[in-house]
Each structure stands twice: as structure tokens, then as C-alpha cells.
UniProtKB/Swiss-Prot annotation:
Organism: Protobothrops flavoviridis
Localization (cell): Secreted
Protein name, entry field: HSF-like protein
Alphabetized PANTHER family for the sequence: ALPHA-2-HS-GLYCOPROTEIN (PTHR13814:SF6), FETUIN (PTHR13814)
Pfam families membership: Cystatin (PF00031)
Domain of life assignment: Eukaryota
Keyword Glycoprotein annotated: yes
Glycosylated residues, chain numbering: 95, 204, 282
Amino acid sequence: MNSLVALVLLGQIIGSTVSFQLGPNMDCNTKGTKDWADIGVHYINEHKLHGYKQALNVIKIFRLLPSDGRSVIFHFNLNLLETECHVLDSTPVENCTVRPQHNHAVEMDCNVRIIHDITTFEDEVFVKCSSTPGSVENILRDCPKCPILLSPNDPHVVDSVEYVLNKHNEKLSGHIYEVLEISRGQHKYEPEAYYLEFVIVEINCTAQEAHDDYHQCHPYTAGEDHIAFCRSTVFRSHASLEKPKDEKFESDCVILDVKEGHAHSHLIEHHVGKYSTSPGYNSTDECVVECPVAFVNKEVPTDISDHNTPPVKGCPGRVLHFQL
């Protein structure tokens, strides 16, 4: 499965408390370079509409571009890896586990341009990314029994998620949930099963109202205990053409602490009312936003006058996790 997703983001990060200092030559391994690259990674994670947060893996290319004398322009080509934290999870990406390679990891290559105004400390950030899962052949060669990634809208994945959700709703007296997003589906053998990851949201309906086509149910979009991230396994055959009825399953759901005003609260609005599957690796998202960035002490290179702007030496940088 070698399809691609294009994630196109355009925005402005404003940091009134950002400070900078003139520093020595920077390459793809210096702390100053990584500080600037982290601005791009932070921006991607704050505005990604689907799926999972991304962690920096390799700074592949770093260029200093021409400027008008008032700004410093950085261009990066970054290799990122998918973590196990959903974008609605408030856990800082630094504390998120990178998805292991044998669990069909996904990488993202991003072109990031940061235009830093040295008088106002404003950063304009331009990002374009493409995402690719690891090779099925390589995974099966190294781990024949490991689960293989499927499209989130695969019929077996969708049916299995709905089956688990119905089982949850049967047990939760007074609380009814619906699927907010199917973010991951995998198939494995020995024993044959479907591994699922999805987000659910509580709705303001009874069980009877939820099954009434004429009754409009509305999800709670903020507050305590209304949104949860679930990891489930449904043991069923890929050859089965019927929807699951009494299959054995395992499931664990964790409440997400998503509050009104949280950086991702607007993403809930994006999903609500649109039974959603993560777009996987073949869609485009755009946004124009402003958000504050925390205090960062960043180095600014002294030489930014080269109009041909070749990549700096010392690139690509170190691999922080692994290469797909």
C-alpha cells in the first residue's frame, strides 16, 4: 500500500515573547536548527485534521533563503514519523510513543518554510507534506505475523468498528456514543483478527432516539468525558461477507481531555456530524490560522545573503528513530 496523502497547510505563528540570537554556522544536527524545525512540526501537529501526531525523525535538507533585510527565511525538508497519539490527544508530542516499525509505521515527508521577521518576531509558516506507509513486503519479510495496514474505510474495518461501538453502547447505561473518526485499521493472522483505532463522541440522545432516522442527535463538542480514543481487536475472518454478530472482541477506550479553547477544539467541529474515516494517504487539507507559540530561544544564522542558497553542509542530519 504505497498511496500518498498531501497535507497542505498555510498559516502564521505569532510569538511576542520569542527571542533570538546570532549564532555560528548551523547544520542539520545543531540544536539551533532543530529548534526551528520543531516550529514546523509543532504547526503540523496543531492543525492536522485527522489521524495522529507526528514526531521529527530526520532533518533531511536545511536551506537559508534570500530575504529583504527584515526577515530570515528557513527552508526545511523534514522526515516525520507517526506517533500513537491521536491529534485530539492533549499529550505533548514529546511524550508520545513513535509507532514501532513492525506495527506498520507511517512516515511523512514535509517541505517547511519559515519566514521570521526579526523586528516583530512573527513567523509565517508554510507546510506541504506527503505521507507514506511502510512497505508491506518489508514488514512481512521481517515479521510474517505482524498486522498489515488497511484503508480506514475498508468494509471489514468499518463493520468491525460499528460492531464494537454497538457493544459499548449496550453496556453504557444512559450514555450513547457515535464514531467521530476511524483513524486506523489492520488485518492479521494467527489468530485472524482486525485491529482498530477510532475516536468516539457522546451524543445527546437515548439509544432509541439514536436509531430513529427522524430524530437529530448532536454530539457534545467539549467538556468532560465526552470524547474517547479506542483500541479494539475483533476476531473474524477476512473471508466473511456478513457483518459481525457474535464475534469475540477486545476493546479499551481512554477518555480524551479535550476542553473548549484547546488548540484542537476546532477540529472536533470539523468532524461532528460527518461519520468520518481518516483520509489515509490520498487527500488534501488546507487551513489558514493564527496561534501563539511558546517562548523559544532560537539561533539566527549570520549569513543569509546567498541568493543561490545551496543546502547547508552537514545534511541530512541524524536519524532520531528509524528509517522506513
